Amino acid sequence: MSDNSKIRVVVGMSGGVDSSVTALLLKEQGYDVIGVFMKNWDDTDEFGVCTATEDYKDVAAVADQIGIPYYSVNFEKEYWDRVFEYFLSEYKAGRTPNPDVMCNKEIKFKAFLDYAMTLGADYVATGHYAQVRRDEDGIVHMLRGVDNGKDQTYFLSQLSQEQLQKTMFPLGHLQKSEVREIAERAGLATAKKKDSTGICFIGEKNFKQFLSQYLPAQKGRMMTVDGRDMGEHAGLMYYTIGQRGGLGIGGQHGGDNQPWFVVGKDLSKNILYVGQGFYHESLMSTSLQASVIHFTRDMPSEFTLECTAKFRYRQPDSKVTVYVKGEHAEVVFDEPQRAITPGQAVVFYDAEECLGGGIIDMAFKDGVACQYI
């Protein structure tokens, strides 16, 4: 049996139950474990509600309980430069970004990984619901977590082979309910702590209010695709493709009483397009173009791939054909898809394996670009 005590694992601890159990399991398996709390956002800012101080106290309590050293590291500058600025620039461009994908790529598995190496780490570990498997050639494959409802490979799709080689996901084979049970059995301070939701730097704040502190909103016209004026919108950045609600038009102006949805945007004219019906024809597309295409292992610069894909988190896989050219790809759907949203991640799968992904730039319907930006 191998001696794990000679293998140092640095665990990213958030003060939540998942990362607490991650540290506990590794400690029980005999690894040399160090806990590190990442402070990524200045919660003294009047708009940040990340409760970093409380979270750090929870990390300290759990680390003391399981008997591991712990540190706090400040990544506020890196987070602002690499994640938050990206988040703002995407909204400014009329897109709907996914900051979690960028945070994993740039902070948790880059800045944190680099820091862990200065502590003499052999590996880093996080509480993500995903699995890593090493094949006989030493290549690491990233697989979905066994808890379908919690699988987080969508958010980890930009990780590189180099990053995966140094990563452990001890919760990947567990259900969330089992993780809670382990925490309760061990009497961990975080056993009953509520899971955090939403974007870290917004916390419980009103999203519109938060965004308007950084980007001035430009009101404009809300129109149907056939040119009827439906009133005023509050600013294009507040709306996402396929969104229902928050439009202020209810069932009015329509003969069929179907709900209204955001079906398009025109950034150059500052127009928000709305239409009735969940499957409104303007919401349906047959292909997309993506950039920042990235695979979790080395691939040729040009190739074609038949696989499945997700276009948003918690969505069933759809069959696609991917035509890759360097960092760009065209993704053609077997069946038309609804509300393909520029700025969101498209993530590729081969059965249980997450192959990688990219960021959606444009959607097309039978070769014609959808008016989504």
Swiss-Prot record:
One annotated GO molecular function: ATP binding
Protein's UniProt keywords contain Disulfide bond: yes
Region annotation (Interaction with tRNA) ranges: 150-152, 312-313
EC numbers: 2.8.1.13
SUPFAM superfamilies in the cross-refs: Adenine nucleotide alpha hydrolases-like (SSF52402)
Function: Catalyzes the 2-thiolation of uridine at the wobble position (U34) of tRNA, leading to the formation of s(2)U34.
Protein name: tRNA-specific 2-thiouridylase MnmA
Organism: Streptococcus uberis (strain ATCC BAA-854 / 0140J)
Gene: mnmA
